[in-house]
Design a protein with these regions (language model features):
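FIC/Doc superfamily catalytic core
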Residues: 1-197
Length: 197
């Protein structure tokens, strides 16, 4: 079976060595059964991940406010930002329900991550998209009519490429996903979430 599309990248020896080193460290961490019995540590790490991911996208809530929202406490802050925290917590809590190779699961993750905060929740964008700094164009995403085919090709590559180490594959997917910018909102949050899937 030929792969329809292959993202443009070359695997260097340095990439391979880093991938092996990271994989070994993950295996070592996973071997500590005591960590599996520490739900508070896992929850705190999840809260820190959520806070960092949202802060990158200008969510102004502090780490303690994010923790309070997740703990069901009343927090004074922008309604949309509070909803973003609730959505992100649900999405990160659902990680084990997502199959990283299924496009439908990516759309489902987006619908969770952008619930009540985005008009096109769980749907690819139907408009042009770009990144701007004032009037200066930083990046223009592919046209909206190309998004479904580009995302299909990306997932087909992900499923069919059995030669690229999984860690490198996930990084290439992240890069390509951010380049395609398939959603009207939440691309960075979903890219970071999917890196965990």
């Amino acid at each position: 079976d030929d792969i329809m599309y292959k993202p443009p990248f070359d695997i260097t020896n340095k990439m391979l060595n880093l991938s092996i080193s990271i994989t070994e460290k993950i295996g070592l961490i996973n071997s500590f059964s005591s960590l599996k019995r520490m739900p508070v540590l896992r929850k705190n790490n999840k809260i820190k991940s959520i806070h960092s991911s949202l802060a990158i996208e200008a969510n102004s809530l502090s780490l303690s406010q994010v923790k309070d929202v997740i703990d069901g406490k009343v927090v004074l802050g922008p309604k949309k930002e509070i909803q973003e925290v609730k959505n992100a917590y649900l999405a990160y809590s659902s990680l084990n329900t997502f199959d990283g190779y299924l496009e439908e699961d990516l759309l489902r993750a987006h619908s969770i991550m952008t619930y009540l905060t985005c008009d096109e929740s769980g749907k690819y964008r139907n408009h042009g998209e770009g990144v701007f700094d004032g009037d200066k164009v930083i990046f223009v995403a592919p046209p909206e009519n190309m998004v479904p085919a580009l995302m299909n090709d990306l997932f087909e590559w992900l499923k069919k490429d059995n030669d690229t180490p999984i860690l490198i594959k996930s990084c290439v997917f992240h890069y390509e996903f951010v380049f395609i910018h398939p959603f009207g909102d939440g691309n960075g949050r979903i890219a970071r979430l999917w890196q965990n899937v």
